[in-house]
């Protein structure tokens, strides 16, 4: 990848206590001791659902509509987001979908770590964003013990933005909060959490534990959150 596109920067999965969710999480039951480590590298991300996943400096996002990406607020608010381009489904061997400048950001007005990022349609290479990505569909819902996958860019610059997918199980859902045991590392913030049909349940926003995150947490997409996202998809 062009060094001007993805520069080495902060790729930390946000520390749990630094988030507004921390006060809610402390009261939630946690049933797992260590995350599953079922992880595989996605070397060719040109097919669904992988071609809907994008890399930011320090995080991940998922495409949900025309020029529209969902990620975390703490990724969208990064000082680097307007300086560095968004890379569409970059992988180590497959053909990437281009590198795009950020147009604007719409933060969710509530405490949830959720934001919309709009990109310019034409990449620096002359590619069309919407012809080189897929749009991930929303799931109707999810429940405890459902199997999930998390796709993203753990350790971003350290791995030269290789894409990885991990699998696990939902352990708890309460309102817009969910806990699961799919393995995650710094750089997975904003990663889509998908069901077995590759439908979007929510996005990862934090983890606890050291190198092997013992618990991982996501923003669960309730009807209200899905409405916010759908209302901010470019027409």
From Swiss-Prot:
Protein encoded by which gene: splA
Catalytic residues of the enzyme: 74, 113, 189
Protein EC: 3.4.21.-
InterPro entries noted in UniProt: Peptidase_S1_PA, Peptidase_S1_PA_chymotrypsin, Peptidase_S1B, Peptidase_S1B_tx, Trypsin_dom, V8_his_AS
Disulfide bonds: none
Name of the protein in question: Serine protease SplA
Compartments reported by the entry: Secreted
Signal sequence annotation: 1-35
Principal localisation: secreted
Highest taxon of the lineage: Bacteria
Family statement: Belongs to the peptidase S1B family.
GO MF, any single term: serine-type endopeptidase activity
Expression induction or repression: Positively regulated by agr (accessory gene regulator).
Keywords: Hydrolase, Protease, Secreted, Serine protease, Signal
Listed GO CC annotations: extracellular region
GO biological-process terms attached to the record: proteolysis
Organism expressing this protein natively: Staphylococcus aureus (strain NCTC 8325 / PS 47)
